[in-house]
Amino acid sequence: MTAKSRILVLNGPNLNLLGLREPTHYGSQTLEQIVATLRDQAQKADIELEHLQSNREYELIEAIHQAFGKVDFIIINPAAFTHTSVALRDALLGVAIPFIEVHLSNVHAREPFRHHSYLSDKAQGVICGLGAQGYEFALSAAIRALQAKQ
């Protein structure tokens, strides 16, 4: 019997406010609704899905470190840490778990300081501007990548 593949979904600062915060940029769905949809999608594919949202950079880094040897793929919306966190980049590189970077809004159509990501050049893929559906696309891509490895 093969062990289930595990995918970790990480969400950075202020994403706990989804549904309330700037719905024109981020949509009206709450993070809980987005994660529930992802859990259903993962369950149908026989994938174990874990989720963490944190406003604290170190908690996201610790989750990445703890994922080493236990998680097969990471989906991360680093939110504002996208543009500032060399530490998140180093953590992801350190564990060498493939990851997809997700953003609800099109960061390239927003303020110039949002255009740079410390993660994009190391990600397997980047999805931005597709709202909550971007997470579903990322999960589908991660599942396909894991199935291709088997």
Swiss-Prot record:
This enzyme's EC code(s): 4.2.1.10
Q: Which GO terms describe its biological process?
A: amino acid biosynthetic process; aromatic amino acid family biosynthetic process; chorismate biosynthetic process; quinate catabolic process
Active site: residue positions: Y26, H103
- Which Gene3D superfamilies does UniProt cross-reference here? Dehydroquinase, class II (3.40.50.9100)
Q: Does the keyword Lyase apply?
A: yes
| Residues bound to substrate | N77, H83, D90, L104, S105, R114
SUPFAM superfamilies noted in UniProt: Type II 3-dehydroquinate dehydratase
Annotated keywords: Amino-acid biosynthesis, Aromatic amino acid biosynthesis, Lyase
**One Pfam family from the UniProt entry?**
DHquinase_II
Site annotation Transition state stabilizer: residues: R21
Pathway(s) of this molecule: Metabolic intermediate biosynthesis; chorismate biosynthesis; chorismate from D-erythrose 4-phosphate and phosphoenolpyruvate: step 3/7
Q: Name one GO molecular function term.
A: 3-dehydroquinate dehydratase activity
Q: Which InterPro entries match?
A: DHquinase_II (IPR001874), DHquinase_II_CS (IPR018509), DHquinase_II_sf (IPR036441)
CDD domains attached here?
A: DHQase_II
Name the catalysed reactions.
Answer: 3-dehydroquinate = 3-dehydroshikimate + H2O
Q: Which PANTHER family match?
A: CATABOLIC 3-DEHYDROQUINASE
Binding partners and assembly = Homododecamer.
User: Record's family?
Assistant: Belongs to the type-II 3-dehydroquinase family.
Q: Which HAMAP family match?
A: AroQ
* Protein's job: Catalyzes a trans-dehydration via an enolate intermediate.
Protein known as:
3-dehydroquinate dehydratase
This protein's species is Vibrio cholerae serotype O1 (strain ATCC 39541 / Classical Ogawa 395 / O395)
